[in-house]
Amino acid sequence: MIDVGSLSKGMYIKYDGDIYRVVDVNKHFRARGSGLIRTKLKNLSSGLVREVNFNSGEKVEEAEVTFRKASYIYNDGEMYYFMDAETFEQYGIPETEIEDEKNYLVENTEVDLIMHDGKPIGIQLPTSVVLEVVETEPGFKGDTVSGGGKPAILETGLKITVPFFVEKGQKVRVDTRTGEYIERA
């Protein structure tokens, strides 16, 4: 059991019988009395995010999770399949459990499988991935005056904003935490 005051973003806890990843933590302290810890928790089995408030001093159970290196191999529309880098064993994860992460997966993407009781319950992406631009408008001379960028659709269907000089067919590096363009690859 850990004190809720020590919760931080990215931790895994057991709450109401399910495993959650801590997405956000805000600590509010009152003049008198105990503090309030507001958290956003993502349920790893359903993918839903819920807000939970704790009083300081409360305790929660830390989930026992392990990470295994794996690579994404394919999906069949319902399940996404990954191969363990050490044992070459294949694991399937339902699409609903990796709803946010699936837009960054192309064949052979290296990920960390989040394992609990020997079963995969989610994935952790690298901080950035390289994806190909499949659709964007051509840039025009003088476009840079307004700054900003233009919309682009990547090979996975992800929509991001890219600088005007990026063209269709080029590869770009995307931050998986924010979904933003980093650089041309």
Swiss-Prot record:
GO molecular function: any one?
Answer: translation elongation factor activity
Biological processes, Gene Ontology terms: peptide biosynthetic process
Q: In which pathway does it act?
A: Protein biosynthesis; polypeptide chain elongation
List keywords of the entry alphabetically: Cytoplasm, Elongation factor, Protein biosynthesis
Q: What is its main location?
A: cytoplasm
Report the sequence similarity comment from the record: Belongs to the elongation factor P family.
Q: What's this protein's function?
A: Involved in peptide bond synthesis. Stimulates efficient translation and peptide-bond synthesis on native or reconstituted 70S ribosomes in vitro. Probably functions indirectly by altering the affinity of the ribosome for aminoacyl-tRNA, thus increasing their reactivity as acceptors for peptidyl transferase.
Do you know which PANTHER family this protein is assigned to? ELONGATION FACTOR P, ELONGATION FACTOR P (EF-P) FAMILY PROTEIN
* Protein name per its UniProtKB record: Elongation factor P
User: What is the gene name?
Assistant: efp
